[in-house]
Amino acid sequence: MTAPLPGQEEIADPAIARDEMVSAFEDQNQNLRSNTSYYEAERRPEAIGVTVPVQMQSLLAHVGYPRLYVDSIAERQAVEGFRLGDADEADEELWQWWQANNLDIEAPLGYTDAYVHGRSYITISRPDPQIDLGWDPNVPLIRVEPPTRMYAEIDPRIGRPAKAIRVAYDAEGNEIQAATLYTPNETFGWFRAEGEWVEWFSDPHGLGAVPVVPLPNRTRLSDLYGTSEITPELRSMTDAAARILMLMQATAELMGVPQRLIFGIKPEEIGVDPETGQTLFDAYLARILAFEDAEGKIQQFSAAELANFTNALDQIAKQVAAYTGLPPQYLSTAADNPASAEAIRAAESRLIKKVERKNAIFGGAWEEAMRLAYRLMKGGDVPPDMLRMETVWRDPSTPTYAAKADAATKLYGNGQGVIPRERARKDMGYSIAEREEMRRWDEEEAAMGLGLLGTMVDADPTVPGSPNPTPAPKPQPAIEGGDSA
């Protein structure tokens, strides 16, 4: 008997595979809590120094370097379409699938989870009319799942999932109440009823591949599962900044106001209750102190300087910028003089190159997901053009609108430059629908210039399905000898 191909082995008992995958999911989920605590800027007791008194631990600051870094990458990523083969424009059907699944909202959230935990997942399934009520049966269900709800076992022989599990917790988030097992040829679903697993659904898709595509934040070829962007060096700088801010707050509270020594004065004169001995702080905060006793003396210590703490925080911010590539202005370490536009772009160069690299990795995952969705909905193999699919990403840099317009105008050069008009419009970021409308206007202007508007010139020469231009009504000649009928 012929052995199954790698990654296409049959699952002998789905229930056993489910239990094994749920156990593996819970094991890996334990390692994700530390990532979440850093991203959420939670207080971490282990970040406090060993000599810090218990009373000061409540002053431990929330430092958001990890969130700032992760969000700075994710917010620059936006998919604009999928181009097949040598096509000039993005594929309309694939983009409709993207929009129908709200992936313009869900995908960026998946990128954030991938940077925090090292990976996210894309799941593909056929709509079930009994479950997915109101869903278009010709549109696949494409979802983005975080690693806190899903786990996929990667087969190192093929670099793709061998099986995957997705779980759903109860309202308290303590117990798993539903699970979906993805295998190369079938998808199984269960839910819990009175503590027992009950079969929910099954979908024998027969793809020969698990309909789950990881979104791994890979940094090396050997890194199959992805690595968190919250690296050990970034964690150590975050903890150090939290400790320094805690000490600065304590110093400001204890020694930020000048302390005074007063001799030869009765306690009642400086606002001390004679019965309880409680200081009322009137003299402590007063600007002018006056006492009746001529022998009274007062001396004052200098207030504590906090510059050493702020200098330390500046050095930590510079280390964070060196580790992450964040521009100085993101960390509030820019100079007093405003930077020029060229200086800002130069400062963002590392961040932009990192986003472009992430786009290439995530773009490959989206292309594989769209190919699986095509096979799932239409059957058979994908067309050759889909094997050369390209994910179209928005420009991750931040040029001003005026700068983009100036560059496009110079490159187009009124038809004499190095790029055509349509390329200039693409560089400006106009959508497909906007460019189609512009082409219609171009043709109308050309027809008006030649005096052909309203004649037998083709009403729709290039853009199928676009609205036809309506010519202006011709004036009716007046009827001699009376009013028009």
Curated annotation (Swiss-Prot):
Top-level taxon in the UniProt lineage: Viruses
Pfam family, one: SPP1_portal
InterPro entries the record matches: Portal_protein_SPP1_Gp6-like
Keyword Chaperone: no
Subcellular location: Virion
Biological processes annotated in GO: symbiont genome ejection through host cell envelope, long flexible tail mechanism
Disordered: annotated segments: 456-485
Keyword match Zinc: no
Biased composition (Pro residues): 464-476
GO cellular component: viral capsid
Swiss-Prot/TrEMBL keywords: Capsid protein, Viral capsid assembly, Viral genome ejection through host cell envelope, Viral genome packaging, Viral long flexible tail ejection system, Viral penetration into host cytoplasm, Viral release from host cell, Virion, Virus entry into host cell
Family to which the UniProt record says this protein belongs: Belongs to the SPP1-like portal protein family.
Function of the protein: Forms the portal vertex of the capsid. This portal plays critical roles in head assembly, genome packaging, neck/tail attachment, and genome ejection. The portal protein multimerizes as a single ring-shaped homododecamer arranged around a central channel. Binds to the terminase subunits to form the packaging machine.
Assembly and interaction partners: Homododecamer.
Protein name per Swiss-Prot or TrEMBL: Portal protein
Gene from which the chain derives: 14
